[in-house]
């Protein structure tokens, strides 16, 4: 009989803090321990920013502080009374009368020793796993083997999950390579700001929903070879920015409704994935999911699709706002393996990877070559009136709402499906009140700089507090960007979401 591969089991207690309370609990991510030598080094000697970036106190000390007092004064002046000055609005027409972070605690066990699971369990705060990881192998760091997930299942009786890790044969002379395993999900670190700026009315809105839903792993990884059927979902975190025009009602409706419409569409796709293999690529699947979601919300706003109303069990066919009201929508689903961005309009999502700002959306402007051709082919006109505008009115070629400009202005989004990288620093979602006065690169560099400066000044917050609500470092970055945009002359509402993609930032000091 062939000798069975040795296995180690560990039991974890997880919290199902999602919108679907009845959904099974599963291990969503395990840390890839191919770099165990780095992970096991002394914490005081680590030069790690959770993505291969070295951060030293000297580096942070060099970050510039100039202009902060001027910005604070600008913000104070703006909040005390915004000037009602005419500017180039999006619309020239009728205006309607609004992760807990997981510490990387690692246990090295000799290959021949016995394991006691009770000794390997880390502290759990409010039912959420704060830290756990097991590496089985030789005591020498250089010889720690790569672990491979075989099973990640759920014990229905105890609401716990068991992970079985297959170990390389002790007689093997080489390490297992090329396998991908996941670390347990980290609560996202985010900060937001949304200010009226120099406008007479606030028409922006935003939505943040950490741990919003469970994403089928087949929508992210496909039928990955060697992946256990028990590892079925990853936790998705939702972020969205909506820049209204002609009034605030459409943006507000998108803020309250769009992520739930997305969850409904993903739930429908889940059923299809369970029943059959669609054979579609993941990009195509996400295109369909977000397009259906955006069209549903647009139909509800227009009154063509029934929508739920508070205090009534029946759905109503009633327009949310007048035909001249609309909104942009840029939303992001962030999970441990991918970022999925869907955009309709001229709000924007930008990823800072390494030292490069990577736009994950492209503004829908009427003078964009493909958009210009689409509008003209539909019988519309792009007229130059304080910039390119559809029929001289709307300064974007796609939006949710704006019934009076259909079919020239459409609610169909463009979707970007982006795998995560170790070098990912932060993700910025913002309305054009920011992007009109600052470019992608400077926004990303400033956001990262302010995050690092906050950590230099305040240190790392307690592990149990991270991920619970707004992250103060991200909030500092968002606030600073909004003040800087005002100082640079932004005339629009400004809404910004800063998401720190580094689960944990550590600094080494030089003596």
UniProtKB/Swiss-Prot annotation:
Q: Which reaction does it catalyse?
A: O-phospho-L-seryl-[protein] + H2O = L-seryl-[protein] + phosphate; O-phospho-L-threonyl-[protein] + H2O = L-threonyl-[protein] + phosphate
Binding residues annotated for Mn(2+) 2, in chain numbering: 243, 432, 492
Broad enzyme group: hydrolase
> Residues of the signal sequence?
1-22
Q: Which Gene Ontology BP annotations are present?
A: abscisic acid-activated signaling pathway
Q: Which residues bind Mn(2+) 1?
A: 243-244
Note the superkingdom of the native organism.
Eukaryota
Q: In which tissues is it expressed?
A: Expressed in seeds, roots, stems, leaves and flowers, especially in meristematic tissues, guard cells, embryo and siliques.
Marked site (Lock) residue numbers: 385
**What EC numbers are recorded for this enzyme?**
3.1.3.16
Q: What induces it?
A: Repressed by MYB44. Induced by ABA.
Subunit structure, interactors included: Interacts with SWI3B (via N-terminus). Interacts with ABA-bounded PYR1, PYL1, PYL2, PYL3, PYL4, PYL5, PYL6, PYL8 and PYL9, and with free PYL2, PYL3, PYL4, PYL10 and PYL13.
Task: Return the domain comment text from this UniProt entry.
Answer: The 'lock' site stabilizes the complex made of PP2C, ABA and PYR/PYL/RCAR receptor by keeping receptor 'gate' and 'latch' loops in closed positions.
Functional summary from the UniProt entry: Key component and repressor of the abscisic acid (ABA) signaling pathway that regulates numerous ABA responses, such as stomatal closure, seed germination and inhibition of vegetative growth. Confers enhanced sensitivity to drought.
What is the recorded name of this protein? Protein phosphatase 2C 16
Origin species: Arabidopsis thaliana (Mouse-ear cress)
Instruction: Supply the source organism's classification.
Output: Eukaryota, Viridiplantae, Streptophyta, Embryophyta, Tracheophyta
